[in-house]
A protein has these predicted regions:
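Mature extracytoplasmic enzyme cores
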Residues: 1-10, 15, 29-40, 44, ...
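Active-site mouth loops of central-metabolism enzymes
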Residues: 16-28
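Conserved short loop/turn motifs at secondary-structure junctions
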Residues: 23, 48-61, 295-300, 327-332
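Catalytic-core region of carbohydrate-active enzymes that cleave or remodel glycosidic bonds
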Residues: 35, 309-315, 319-322, 338-361, ...
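Active-site clefts of carbohydrate-active enzymes
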Residues: 49-51, 186-189, 393-400
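Substrate-binding cleft/loops of secretory-pathway carbohydrate-active enzymes
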Residues: 87-100, 233-256, 315, 319-363
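Conserved, well-ordered alpha-helix/loop/beta-strand core segments that scaffold catalytic motifs
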Residues: 211-220, 297-325
């Protein structure tokens, strides 16, 4: 009854916060936009920062110096989209200035060798990317030449046999695959972007965007400034929008960080290097367990390093953290353009966000295949799964 009485008094709570596209317009134009929004009964907006030519520069601050008092006068709250480029993670160019903190990938190159071989040598230096850092070299038995599978047993660690660009070895009879495992910051997806698996990398975004806003407008935090919005942050280990990027795919770089390496070394112990090829290739009975462990540790770092860190910063400064990821066709459980685990990414956010765009939910198209703007996609997921992700997170996560 209290809600009904409030509605009858015209005291409806805010349930919508449209983007106010910031393109560097003059303040009078912005005032006109705010008036129109207010006339629609809307009391919250999200500043769409990315079209602005001077985000976190003098032009941006001039606009916010005008918007925030106007919002206060009109009883409106303001959210801020947290970056200068799509998707969230560019940190307003922060990784151009701090390249050592940008995204890192785990990569492999290999060649096949047939034993027996004594005093063998292979030039492997050129297997690495120009910036590649060698992680290890393995000789892995191949069970046959019919598939890409390798053996999970009998693996030889040749890392300490690497010298001056060559690896030297003796091999017993049989076919072997020589794996060169390395890390690199090039050749993957969005390279000048933050590493969601690295706390220091995510801190660059906070320093470049969040802290700068707080330093200028502390008196508006928690009242007029409601919080920050992240748009489709991604692991970004490969280019584009493959919704099916999982482990077990050849020639794919994988998300990586020093924190992830430390976690996997603790889990796998002496088998750390020997277990890595299973991330790309079938390696016997141990393959599923290795892949589950990698995904578990990796997405756990998404939670703690990325969403948890941003959410904690916002809470400490009296505001909230909201946004969404790419969920299309179950991509929320995968890598590339998404983050591997919807619920872990959402844990740091204060609302359970989803993205419904491009005619994804169309009445009647409830089966696994229907045509939408991106091709033949999963109508069953869009119809019955997508919204349920958000409602489930809202029920099970206490900060929602």
């Amino acid at each position: 009854m209290e809600r009904l009485d409030a509605l009858l008094r015209g005291e409806a709570p805010s349930h919508i916060l449209p983007f106010l596209w910031m393109k560097g317009e003059d303040n009078e134009t912005i005032r006109e936009e705010l008036v129109k929004i207010e006339e629609c009964g809307i009391r919250e907006i999200c500043l769409e920062s990315r079209p602005h030519p001077d985000f976190c520069g003098p032009g941006w601050w001039e606009n916010l110096d005008f918007i925030l008092p106007e919002a206060r006068k009109r009883g409106m709250r303001v959210w801020i989209l947290d970056d200068d480029k799509f998707p969230t993670g560019h940190a307003n160019g922060g990784f151009i200035r701090n390249p050592e903190k940008k995204k890192v990938y785990l990569a492999e190159r290999h060649m096949d060798i047939c034993g027996p071989c004594r005093s063998g040598a292979v030039l492997v230096e050129n297997f690495l990317q120009p910036d590649g850092k060698l992680l290890g070299i393995l000789a892995v038995p191949k069970p046959d030449g019919q598939t890409l599978a390798v053996s999970g047993d009998g693996i030889m660690d040749l890392t300490d046999r690497y010298e001056n660009g060559f690896v030297y070895f003796d091999l017993p009879p049989g076919p072997y695959r020589l794996f060169v495992l390395y890390t690199t910051q090039t050749g993957g997806g969005r390279e000048d972007y933050m590493n969601l698996l690295d706390s220091d990398s995510v801190r660059v975004l906070i320093d470049e965007v969040h802290e700068k806003h707080y330093a200028r407008y502390p008196e508006y935090f928690g009242n007029i400034i409601a919080g920050f919005f992240s748009d489709e942050p991604e692991l970004g280990n490969v280019n584009g929008y493959p919704f099916d990027n999982t482990l077990g795919q050849k020639d794919r770089k994988l998300p990586w960080s020093g924190q992830l390496e430390a976690a996997l070394r603790e889990k796998w112990g002496d088998d750390f290097l020997a277990d890595l090829p299973a991330l790309w290739y079938e390696s016997g009975e141990k393959t599923p367990g290795i892949r589950v462990t990698y995904m578990d540790e990796m997405t756990g770092l998404v939670r703690t390093c990325f969403s948890g860190q941003l959410g904690s910063w916002c809470e400490a400064h009296g505001v909230e953290y909201i946004g969404h990821i790419i969920e299309d066709d179950n991509a929320h459980t995968r890598m590339a353009c998404s983050i591997g685990h919807y619920f872990r990414e959402m844990e740091g956010q204060h609302m359970a966000g989803i993205d419904v765009v491009h005619h994804q939910i169309v009445p009647g198209f409830t089966e696994p295949v229907h045509q939408w703007i991106a091709g033949d996609r999963d109508g069953e997921f869009f119809h019955f799964g997508l919204a349920k992700l958000g409602s489930s997170a809202a029920h099970i996560q206490a900060n929602k």
